[in-house]
């Protein structure tokens, strides 16, 4: 049994999953994916530090929407309100785009009486504006390849592709 566990959860499992992934004919065309990074270069170009005002995210959604993307995905958890004008601007952009997906996150919280996994979701205003929500956090294997996704929550990639989402 120990040998079986090693085979199913070790290097052979990774090789097996990699081979199946390689042979899968329904892979997405990476030429169809555009990533707009929010990084140090972006901060310098915008002459702003993080967090950016929500108007910036709203304008980003408005500009990207002009190219009619299948979806616009933010790997950012907008869990706290900003100022009302800024949040409303972003919510309006989300509503107009009709294809925005925002991140949620899971974390373990330990309390005095109860401990458990808690989901952190975007503020209600953005979901009411039509944003879909997907789980952002995934864990890579020891070789830094992501092969497993949580099965109890819709990941950002599943929501973007329309898989497993109501």
Regions found by a protein language model. Give the residues of each.
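Non-transmembrane functional regions of envelope-associated proteins
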Residues: 1-166
């Amino acid at each position: 049994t120990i040998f079986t566990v090693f085979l199913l959860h070790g290097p052979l499992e990774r090789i097996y999953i990699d081979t199946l992934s390689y042979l899968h004919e329904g892979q997405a065309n990476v030429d169809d994916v555009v990533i707009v990074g929010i990084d140090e270069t972006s901060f310098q170009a915008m002459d702003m530090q993080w967090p950016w005002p929500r108007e910036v995210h709203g304008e980003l959604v408005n500009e990207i929407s002009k190219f009619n993307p299948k979806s616009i995905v933010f790997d950012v958890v907008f869990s706290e309100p900003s100022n009302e004008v800024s949040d409303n601007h972003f919510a309006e952009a989300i509503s107009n785009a009709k294809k925005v997906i925002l991140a949620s996150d899971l974390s373990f919280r330990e309390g005095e009486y109860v401990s458990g996994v808690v989901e952190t979701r975007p503020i209600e205003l953005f979901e009411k504006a039509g944003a879909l929500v997907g789980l952002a956090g995934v864990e890579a294997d020891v070789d830094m390849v992501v092969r497993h996704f949580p099965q109890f929550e819709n990941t950002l990639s599943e929501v973007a592709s329309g898989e497993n989402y109501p």
